Amino acid sequence: MSFKFHKLILNILKQNPNTLILSSDNALREFSVFQALFPKRVINFGISEANMVSYAAGLSSCGKIPFVFGIASFLTMRAFEQIRYDVAIPKSNVKLIGMDAGCSLSGFGNSHYAINDIALIGTLKQIRLFCPASLDELHSLFTEDLTVDSPSYYRLQL
């Protein structure tokens, strides 16, 4: 991810004290920088996407706005039940960010292909689905999404 993307994440944390960043394993490559600056608002869940999504829903019920970063294939498939029951149905204000969508991580094998994440999330009518084509578009969407109390999924191939 680019410097511009990291700056975008830092701005989200700086501008809104109710935002948190939850990340699974290596979804955010500069995770340690964010965690050093915001140790109580940036949490690494390791390879535990399902627990991370349920935790995010709990935070949302307390008025927080969690941004949940995960490798798209694992975030959408391993945690789909939690996304459905904990985020979509109660309309929890959770922002799901599927990183490295499509075949971006093809070097790691077909388990890392996220070619059906849109189809899965698209079955959940309560979740707004975005596929930004640029960091500028992502910035606009994140800024607007902070004012909307509903779940979202961002499919990123940036």
Residue ranges and their predicted role:
Residues 1-157:
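Thiamine diphosphate
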